[in-house]
Amino acid sequence: MVNPQVIGYIGAAVASLFFGSNYVPVKNYPTGNGLAFTWVMSVGTLVVAYCAMFISKDYIFDPWGLLGGTLWSIGNFCVIPIVKTIGIGLGLLLWCCSSIITGYFTGKFGWFGIDKQKVSHPALNWIGFACIVAAVIFFFFIEPTIEEKDEHSYSSIVDDSEIGNNGIDNNGYNSINNNNNNGNNKRRSGAFNKQPKKSIFERMPPPYNTILGIVLSVFSGIMYGVNMVPMQLWKQSNVDASPLSFVFCHFSGIFLANTAVFIVYSIIVRPPQIFPQTIFPSFFSGLLWGIANVGLMVATQNLGYTIGFPMGSGGPMIVSSLWSVFYFREIQGVKNLLILLISFIFLGAGITILALSH
């Protein structure tokens, strides 16, 4: 029989590889306000759940699993206002830190009813955890070279700027008979490539927008950090059960939460913003994310929250950074590469020390 620790380390490696790569398919495609993207992505995760159910030949459908998936989705919904208020750089730093800290402390101190995890070398465990947090902080000082993509050069199924213009009547439906030819000519001429109205988050004055962004980032990280708690509680009552048995209900929670939000959004915003060319990349991104989360679930169950979760959550930063350096060329210059190297050293040391502390 394979050692559970070995399985846990393999799970952490899978999580690191696929979490670090799951947004690569949509990198060069428009995502708009992100709601359609996250819903299609959740469909991809559900496909992974069915595959896991087929492999394990056993599954449960526990309300606690739905809760776990919903907690993750709540954290993910915060990403849109975070990016609008404080940007992806600071936001990513804050939610990564709060996620790793929350997950580590949850297992270390037995929060939310989880059994406290005991390790052979507590001092090494703390040092490894501190190294991973330090690595995340170092990542913040990297200044990427990012070429902004103009999402208005893409055509959504119905552009936001069409709302209220000719072609959309007062009830929000397409007045095809009256303005079809007019609308087609405007679309071909680029008349609909107007700047959409700024969101409520972008209109907030400083420092309120910054405060909101920071609060949402920390909250989002906490949701990411506790989304595995229901699975851990279930595992404590089903010691011999496979983590693959829990995947379906957990991912169903993600799918149902995203579906509910997208339906409400589609009712309120008529018509919703959907980019056809982004649908398949979003679905593929969901497949990669689903595989990654299965790896994290395996790592967390076999290594515990204080080891498996930080390893599976910190490792993706290495992979995503390598994509940025060698493929997208976003991280350039001696200074940035030196900071990245220091981050890698701290992250690698932290993961290694965590493994040794077990």
UniProtKB/Swiss-Prot annotation:
Pfam families named among the record's database cross-references: TMEM144
Domain of life (superkingdom): Eukaryota
Location in the cell: Membrane
Membrane topology designation: Multi-pass membrane protein
One GO cellular component, as annotated: membrane
GO molecular function, one term: carbohydrate transmembrane transporter activity
Keywords: Membrane, Transmembrane, Transmembrane helix
Membrane-spanning ranges: 6-26, 35-55, 60-79, 86-108, 122-142, 211-231, 244-264, 279-299, 307-327, 337-357
PANTHER family: TRANSMEMBRANE PROTEIN 144, TRANSMEMBRANE PROTEIN 144 HOMOLOG B
Family of the protein in this entry: Belongs to the TMEM144 family.
Protein name per UniProt: Transmembrane protein 144 homolog B
Native organism: Dictyostelium discoideum (Social amoeba)
Lineage: Eukaryota, Amoebozoa, Evosea, Eumycetozoa, Dictyostelia
